[in-house]
């Protein structure tokens, strides 16, 4: 947060001298924040998503309004399906960008041929950005599953390791699938 402020306006220094508040330990959820953007040296966001896909053992569900991954992520999704992981991609049937819709659909044939299930949500413009890995790890935030989010935009996401939270995300995903 402070870093983003200082990038936008280097004269803002009040955040640099303040310690963050102590984190509450209520609810029993373990969560980890990660940020990315063009000024960060490492592609941390990309690495986290790639690792999540490669670590999936049983089931992986991705929900994104904009789907335009690079070849590495496509290969990881197809490899996950090939090793028996149930991989589901939920995208909007109608997109607010025709170009993005065409681009997204260009990946579908290879993914479906490898065993990835693609569900087109028809209940409006789907804007959820999430991954649910083996019903036990959730990743959500501002990042779309596309090159703009992965390489150009400032994004923030949260990884949550909590069965209760993952169960709620699973119910939300099920509601999307019912409308697909």
What are these regions, as identified by a protein language model?
Residues 1-180:
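Charged, low-complexity intrinsically disordered terminal segments
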């Amino acid at each position: 947060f402070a870093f983003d402020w200082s990038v936008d306006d280097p004269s803002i220094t009040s955040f640099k001298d303040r310690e963050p508040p102590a984190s509450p330990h209520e609810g029993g959820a373990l969560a980890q924040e990660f940020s990315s953007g063009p000024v960060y040296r490492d592609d941390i966001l990309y690495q986290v998503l790639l690792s999540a896909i490669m670590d999936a053992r049983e089931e992986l569900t991705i929900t994104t309004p904009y789907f335009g991954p690079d070849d590495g992520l496509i290969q990881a999704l197809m490899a996950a399906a090939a090793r028996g992981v149930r991989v589901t991609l939920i995208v909007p049937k109608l997109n607010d960008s025709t170009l993005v819709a065409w681009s997204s659909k260009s990946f579908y044939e290879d993914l479906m041929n490898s065993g990835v299930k693609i569900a087109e949500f028809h209940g409006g413009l789907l804007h959820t950005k999430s991954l649910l890995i083996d019903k036990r790890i959730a990743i959500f935030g501002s990042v779309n599953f596309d090159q703009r989010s992965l390489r150009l935009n400032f994004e923030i996401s949260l990884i949550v390791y909590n069965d209760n939270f993952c169960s709620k995300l699973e119910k939300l995903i099920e509601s999307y699938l019912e409308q697909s």
